[in-house]
From Swiss-Prot:
Gene: rsmA
GO molecular function term, any single one: 16S rRNA (adenine(1518)-N(6)/adenine(1519)-N(6))-dimethyltransferase activity
Organism of derivation: Wolbachia sp. subsp. Drosophila simulans (strain wRi)
GO cellular component: cytosol
Keyword vocabulary terms for this entry: Cytoplasm, Methyltransferase, RNA-binding, rRNA processing, S-adenosyl-L-methionine, Transferase
Name of the protein this chain belongs to: Ribosomal RNA small subunit methyltransferase A
Keyword Coiled coil appears in the UniProt entry: no
Subcellular location: Cytoplasm
EC assignment: 2.1.1.182
Length: 272
């Protein structure tokens, strides 16, 4: 394979899957693809693309930023006319609703350099998707799936798990890719919830969690001072002492805190 591959572009975070066994495991996690439209990001040379097409989706749309790699999909396009299409585009800047109809599943080996930003973009429109089966660098997957009182728990964990049921499925060693990355990868499954687990303004929650986790070793009372001039009132209404550190709070507690930050001038505290 190394003999005919174009030189992978580090600037695009390209690492291609070598194992067909891994592509089979990934696609199987997405469940039945019949009657579903599928989006793939960064198809590369088409290893995952081919496995998706084996499962007979209603349609498959691949989004590839590298023009040189788009050209390598001519054979797949000919073999699956009317079912498969590929566009040259940056996944960060496309509007999925304009490109494909629901119901939609996403199956992707995400480019390392855009994986977090792209996932956050999808979270902001999560109801558009039926489910997502995604490969991340292991460190990011650990952050997404982390629980309170762990070193990986942070803003990404809170936002992801508020909106979705998420499961880390398996890890992948560097030897399974070309070029071989220095880090391990992990596959997670993401199932959007009909409604968030707790009622909250997502913009306020995002601002809050990013602010306090940027100072994760500080007690909550100190880190909240960058967000509100009414720290003690907010803490009292949220039933917190202020001595907690951000990693100690559950998602429910963060939502209660965000609600009270947003409603400083309410006559009574906001409950969930």
């Amino acid at each position: 394979m190394k003999k005919f591959l174009l030189k992978p572009k580090k600037s695009l975070g390209q690492n291609f899957i070598l194992s067909s066994e891994i592509t089979k495991k990934i696609v199987a996690l997405a469940g039945s693809l019949e009657n579903f439209n599928v989006i793939e990001i960064g198809p590369g040379y088409g290893a995952l693309t081919r496995e998706i097409l084996v499962h007979n989706p209603k349609s498959l749309l691949s989004i590839e930023k590298d023009r040189d790699l788009v050209k390598h999909h001519d054979q797949l396009l000919n073999e699956h006319q009317g079912k498969y299409r590929i566009i040259e585009a940056d996944a960060l800047h496309v509007t999925e609703e304009e490109l494909i109809e629901r119901p939609v599943k996403v199956i992707a080996n995400l480019p390392y350099n855009i994986s977090v930003v792209l996932f956050l973009k999808w979270l902001n429109n999560i109801k558009f998707f039926t489910n997502l089966t995604l490969m991340f660098q292991k460190e990011v997957a650990d952050r997404i799936t982390a629980r309170p009182n762990s070193k990986d728990y942070g803003s990404l964990s809170v936002l992801s798990q508020l909106l979705c049921d998420i499961k880390k499925e398996f890890d992948i060693e560097p030897k399974e890719f070309f070029p071989r990355p220095k880090i391990h990868s992990s596959v997670i499954t993401v199932n959007p919830l009909p409604i968030p687990k707790f009622a909250v303004n997502l913009e306020t929650l995002t601002r809050l969690t990013r602010a306090v986790f940027s100072q994760r070793r500080k007690m909550l009372r100190n880190s909240l001072q960058n967000i509100t001039n009414h720290t003690e009132t907010v803490l009292e209404n949220a039933k917190l002492s202020g001595n907690e550190r951000p990693e100690n709070l559950t998602i429910e507690q963060f939502c209660l805190l965000a609600n009270n930050v947003e409603c400083l001038f309410c006559k009574s505290p906001i409950a969930i």
